[in-house]
């Protein structure tokens, strides 16, 4: 599984050793935040740049559109998934989408987890994109990816950003580490607890 780590998830991992283990045991953890990539550069990783969930997802999708790679999408609401599918079909018409399921917005039972993994295995998915929000999505990927052959990728709000449901921050805000403020202004109820704590 692959995680995208930002300041919020870094602080959460520092405070919660179980979640820290989830982040540390991932196949790859992307620096999804300018502060993290800046620290990496200062620590000697001169080419470390910011890699956001939406950017990474769209790059992988673009690179695999005309290949045999199969994609499965899990998370967000049905309405937002429909918007994502509409966008992907319009912009990547040859992309192989083999499954798409909304979040149930509650923990899955063991039976539901097993059935989800069975559906993913039956679909022969190569990539499982998960949008449940941190830290839930990373824990979800760490737990369930063991039961499939697919690469699970936790991408948070990427479904909603890529589809245009939630607009991306202007480039100048991204360049000045202010994307969090823009996102907070667009989703104050959802993000209040994250940014105030």
Task: Name every feature range the model reports, one short phrase each.
Residues 1-55:
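N-terminal nucleotide/polyanion-binding subdomain common to many enzyme families
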Residues 35-42, 169, 173-197:
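A transmembrane-helix-recognition feature enriched in membrane-embedded lipid enzymes
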Residues 36-38, 136, 158-163:
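Short gly/pro/ser/thr-enriched loop/turn and capping motifs at secondary-structure boundaries
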Residues 37-123:
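Conserved beta-alpha
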Residues 69, 148-150:
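A short helix->loop->beta-strand "cap" motif at the edges of active sites that frequently abuts
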Residues 85, 138-147:
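Short Gly/Thr/Asp-enriched flexible loops that form oxyanion-binding sites at enzyme active sites
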Residues 102-108, 150-186:
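Short, flexible loop segments at boundaries between secondary-structure elements
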Residues 120, 124-134, 150:
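Proline-aspartate-enriched helix->loop->beta-strand connector
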């Amino acid at each position: 599984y692959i995680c995208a780590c930002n300041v919020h998830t870094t602080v959460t991992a520092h405070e919660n050793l179980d979640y820290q283990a989830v982040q540390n045991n991932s196949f790859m953890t992307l620096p999804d935040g300018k502060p993290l990539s800046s620290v990496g550069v200062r620590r000697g990783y001169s080419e470390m740049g910011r890699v956001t969930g939406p950017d990474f997802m769209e790059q992988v999708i673009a690179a695999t559109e005309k290949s045999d790679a199969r994609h499965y999408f899990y998370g967000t609401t049905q309405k937002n998934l429909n918007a994502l599918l509409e966008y992907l079909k319009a912009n990547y018409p040859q992309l192989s989408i083999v499954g798409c399921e909304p979040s149930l917005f509650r923990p899955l039972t063991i039976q539901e987890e097993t059935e989800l993994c069975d559906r993913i295995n039956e679909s022969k998915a190569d990539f499982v994109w998960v949008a449940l929000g941190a830290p839930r999505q990373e824990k979800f990927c760490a737990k369930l990816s063991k039961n499939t052959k697919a690469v699970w990728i936790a991408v948070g709000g990427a479904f909603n950003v890529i589809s245009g449901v939630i607009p991306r921050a202007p480039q100048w805000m991204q360049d000045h580490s202010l994307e969090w403020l823009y996102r907070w202004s667009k989703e104050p109820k959802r993000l209040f607890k994250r940014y105030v704590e």
